[in-house]
Amino acid sequence: MAEPWAGQFLQALPATVLGALGTLGSDFLREWETQDMRVTLFKLLLLWLVLSLLGIQLAWGFYGNTVTGLYHRPDPHPQPPAAMGVFLPPGLGGQNGSTPDGSTHFSSWEIAANEALKTHRE
């Protein structure tokens, strides 16, 4: 069975931890306020973060539909790529824009050269 002092210690632990965190926070704020350069740096970094997020949001507004059209998973009732406004070269356009299953990884101009393709055994 637990000693009575162990129970008292566990009850006082959250108050002690919160007091230490409060002291640490007030010391940090006091140091922060005396350093004008830190405040300026913080404001600049915060401004940069906000502008970056706004830029990402703006870019997604312009190009989001294009990206979604290029990287979507095909549905059970597939439509031709031209119907989605995506024009792919012949032989490309599997799931997520990769090469279809069973195709080679060579581009069409290398295959059209009428060269015998080497396998990994050669």
From Swiss-Prot:
Record topological domains on the Extracellular side: 2-8, 65-122
Bilayer-crossing regions: 9-29, 44-64
A single Gene Ontology CC term: membrane
Topological domains annotated Cytoplasmic: 30-43
Glycosylated residues (UniProt): 96
Alphabetical keyword list: Acetylation, Glycoprotein, Membrane, Transmembrane, Transmembrane helix
Xref: PANTHER family: T-CELL LEUKEMIA TRANSLOCATION-ALTERED GENE PROTEIN
General function of this protein: May be required for cellular fusion during osteoclastogenesis.
UniProt similarity note: Belongs to the TCTA family.
Protein name: T-cell leukemia translocation-altered gene protein homolog
Organism: Mus musculus (Mouse)
Protein encoded by which gene: Tcta
